[in-house]
């Protein structure tokens, strides 16, 4: 039995594994770009299949493709979407910057599979042509940007945003639950005036709410599709109604608000929509890193740290120190946030580096974008499930630190003035006294006045979180 078959493209014949659906151009890419291990993301492959499916339907409706061929292409695309042919898409991220080889990989797989569905022999009887039929009314230059936007928008809507909302809700519930717990605040890693634990967590909630708004603001641009621009944005070789119809078809089959890009030149020449959307993801990463750092600092200890909150103990933390448990969810979240920030630099460079009518950094851009979405979505889910939901206050420790803080002296500013209040704090710190003892020793106020004026619960403003 032959292990290879001969496939042809415009450069001639080349041997292809006999059991594979791909053709000559895919094989050439495999042989010429043996670079690292990163492959085109499955979600991007499926977005390409969705794009080809929609194009086949619209080309049929416009009388440009026979019903027989269009139906076979759609059936083949549905098989790809069902995961039946995942191993037919082996190409590296590090290929042509337009994604042409991955577009042709999809064209060849769908053409060979559609030909089989129409009774042809794999690679022998080409009843459906990869360029003339599967790629009809298209160019890699508008197909690949379209697939990028489809994959990105679906990932944001289905993966990231739900997890962001869930984590925000969890922290909002914690903020309300801890609204009456007065604790010491900290600025510059030094003691500051009091606030409630609920107020502190409300800041985290507001950060995430703003992040959601920024991400949602970026979505309409991502929903604009380049399809119909063909090679340079002019729409050469397309029907006048094709661009609008194919965007409408993609909107229907994905249940997402896709529209045809109003300016195809921008859609082909730039990656601005993804640069801007990833900027919002970078902002989310910055917020999550701050939250995770705050959580692990507040939970530090158990005996020699801050220890104001407890977090779930999920696994042993040391191979040498018995009983040690570490804030592993916080550490995982901070690491992936660093990766997202690095991805943002690469995406910015790629987005800024397109020349004239086409950006040619697209595979790298979408690889990093989808990785960031997956990291953030999975990271938030894990952090929420294994850490955030289990945050609990250590009231005894909170009260101990609150009552030992010298910064409660700030409450005296309006009664005895800043200079005398500072003198009290310095004396207490230098001599190891309580604030009350130092104040009485200096004779600046009576015991009754101190007890009336220095009341932490009255120093937090409204007890409502967010005040």
Swiss-Prot record:
One of its GO terms (biological process) is fumarate metabolic process. Pfam families: FumaraseC_C, Lyase_1. This is Fumarate hydratase class II. It is found in: Cytoplasm. GO terms for cellular component: cytoplasm. Homotetramer. Transmembrane segments: none annotated. It comes from Escherichia coli O157:H7. Belongs to the class-II fumarase/aspartase family. Fumarase subfamily. Substrate binds at residues 98-100, 126, 129-132, 139-141, 187, 319, 324-326. Keywords: Cytoplasm, Lyase, Tricarboxylic acid cycle. Involved in the TCA cycle. Catalyzes the stereospecific interconversion of fumarate to L-malate. It comes from the Bacteria. The gene is fumC. The lineage of its organism: Bacteria, Pseudomonadati, Pseudomonadota, Gammaproteobacteria, Enterobacterales. Signal peptide: none annotated. It is an enzyme of class 4 (lyase). PANTHER family: ASPARTATEAMMONIA/ARGININOSUCCINATE/ADENYLOSUCCINATE LYASE (PTHR11444), FUMARATE HYDRATASE, MITOCHONDRIAL (PTHR11444:SF1). Its EC number is 4.2.1.2. GO terms for molecular function: fumarate hydratase activity. There are 2 substrate-binding sites: the catalytic A site, and the non-catalytic B site that may play a role in the transfer of substrate or product between the active site and the solvent. Alternatively, the B site may bind allosteric effectors. Its main location: cytoplasm. CDD domains: Fumarase_classII.
């Amino acid at each position: 039995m032959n292990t290879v078959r001969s496939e042809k493209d415009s450069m001639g014949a080349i041997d292809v594994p006999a059991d594979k659906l791909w053709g000559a151009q895919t094989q050439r890419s495999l042989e010429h770009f043996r670079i690292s291990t990163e492959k085109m993301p499955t979600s991007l492959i499926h977005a390409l299949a969705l794009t080809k499916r929609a194009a086949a339907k619209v080309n049929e409706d416009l009388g440009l493709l026979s019903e027989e061929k269009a139906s076979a292409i759609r059936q083949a695309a549905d098989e790809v979407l069902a995961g039946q042919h995942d191993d037919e898409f082996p190409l590296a991220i590090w290929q042509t910057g337009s994604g042409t080889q991955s577009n042709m990989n999809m064209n060849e797989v769908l053409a060979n599979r559609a030909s089989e569905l129409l009774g042809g022999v794999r690679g022998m009887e080409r009843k459906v042509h990869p360029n003339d039929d599967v790629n009809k009314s298209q160019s890699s230059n508008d197909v690949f940007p379209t697939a990028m936007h489809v994959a990105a928008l679906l990932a944001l809507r289905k993966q990231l945003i739900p997890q962001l909302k869930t984590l925000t809700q969890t922290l909002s519930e914690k903020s309300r639950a801890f609204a009456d717990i007065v604790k010491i605040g900290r600025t510059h890693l030094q003691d500051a005036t009091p606030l409630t634990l609920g107020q502190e967590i409300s800041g985290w909630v507001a950060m995430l709410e703003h992040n959601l708004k920024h991400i949602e603001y970026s979505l309409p641009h991502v929903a604009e599709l380049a399809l119909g621009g063909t090679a340079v944005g002019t729409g050469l070789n397309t029907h006048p109604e094709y661009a609008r119809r194919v965007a409408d078809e993609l909107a229907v089959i994905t249940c997402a608000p896709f529209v045809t890009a109003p300016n195809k030149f921008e859609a082909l020449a730039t990656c601005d929509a993804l640069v801007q959307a990833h900027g919002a993801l970078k902002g989310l990463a910055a917020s999550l890193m701050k939250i995770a750092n705050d959580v692990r600092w507040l939970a530090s200890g158990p005996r020699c740290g801050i220890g104001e909150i407890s977090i779930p103990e999920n696994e042993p933390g040391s191979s040498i120190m018995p009983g040690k448990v570490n804030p592993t969810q916080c550490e995982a979240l901070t690491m992936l946030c660093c990766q997202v920030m690095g991805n943002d630099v690469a995406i910015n460079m790629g987005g800024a580096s397109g020349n004239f009518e086409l950006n040619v950094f697209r595979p790298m851009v979408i690889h990093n974008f989808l990785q960031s979405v997956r990291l953030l979505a999975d990271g938030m889910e894990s952090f929420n499930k294994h850490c955030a939901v289990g945050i609990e206050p250590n009231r005894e420790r909170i009260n101990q630190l609150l009552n030992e803080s010298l910064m409660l002296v700030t409450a005296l500013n309006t009664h005895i003035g800043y200079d005398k209040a500072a003198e009290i704090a310095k004396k207490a710190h230098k001599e190891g006294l309580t604030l009350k003892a130092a104040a009485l020793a200096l004779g600046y106020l009576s015991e009754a006045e101190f007890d009336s004026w220095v009341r932490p619960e009255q120093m937090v403003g409204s007890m409502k979180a967010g005040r």
